[in-house]
Amino acid sequence: MLNGNEWHQLHGDFLSDTQHLMGRADECLSHLELISDDKDAVECLLGTLQQIAGKSDAAHVQAIASFARQLRYLLYFAGAAGRLQPKALISLRQCLSLLSWQIELVDPLTGQLPLDDTEQQHLLEQFGCCCGIGQVESSPAVPVEWPVPITSVHSDAALGERAERSSAL
């Protein structure tokens, strides 16, 4: 943990660097909104989130480092699976907006972010659900529109049929 004087010296660089990186992340996301399967835009966003996490680690702002890493993790799998549909991109934009806002809220004197991670976790779960990655069991349900009606009866034949449909997707 940095003391107040060390953090104060580091704060200007941290804020400037992360704001620049957030601008780049916004450009990458805007490109993804135009061309949702653009691998270069996904790679740019993944690299940018990794740099934000690294800068946050160096500045000892763990809440932001952790959020950037978790978002990168979900984005990596969603991009690899080709699941960055419009709803997922809207959710991703919400995550990036929160990240940007939290960077602005880091206390310039102490380097602390005086917030809990409830909203971060909610948005990460929402993004994961929009990408088809799933949600954490302890979280409240997030509405998802399924392309096929879900039945509550689980017969062996129905499970086999669902497995065949899943592998076809």
Stretches found by the model and what they are:
Residues 1-169:
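Non-catalytic helical tethers at domain boundaries
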